[in-house]
Amino acid sequence: FEDEELQEVKERFFREAATAGRLNHPNIVSIYDAGEEHDLAYIAMEFLKGHDLVPYTKADNLLPLETVVEMIAKVADALAYAHTQNVVHRDIKPANIMYDAATNTPKVTDFGIARITDSSKTKTGVVLGTPSFMSPEQLAGQKISGSSDLFSLGVMLYQLLSGTLPFEGDSMAQLMYRIANDEPTNILTLKPELP
């Protein structure tokens, strides 16, 4: 890393620790400590069982409907709590949700690009996140709120139930246009057995 890049990486690292560290919820990973020792940055966090939700986004490996609904409700509750603490995650996606199948417990992780919404550091014009899961206002670089996290959670729900994303494109520009302007494919055309 160049000096400037290294500083930016460190700032993101410690921002994640500070942001997640102020949140105390059973479905948000707990951060116990963060620091730097001998030029090595560290975060001491809760040990999590399980793995992320990415394997369950494949059409041949979907979780049962009841499991998905219960899990999404828990993640929504965790996000509602974060939003009451003025924290918007900004990158909700299956890779950032750890899941313990034995206890049906999801944990929201990776607050690295989260923003404290009452902070002066919240800016418009900056696009951060994973495009397939981003809200139209986030793609446009507008100031975002908790509703953007809920849009991303809805995209994740769609993918966990159907094995496909609601918006796809052959290029980044086409994907962004579709998210901003098109309606998603009706999930019942993909999974007519859903209630």
What kind of region is each of these model predictions?
Residues 1-185, 189:
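Conserved ATP-binding/catalytic core of the eukaryotic-like protein kinase fold
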Residues 193-195:
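Conserved C-terminal C-lobe helix
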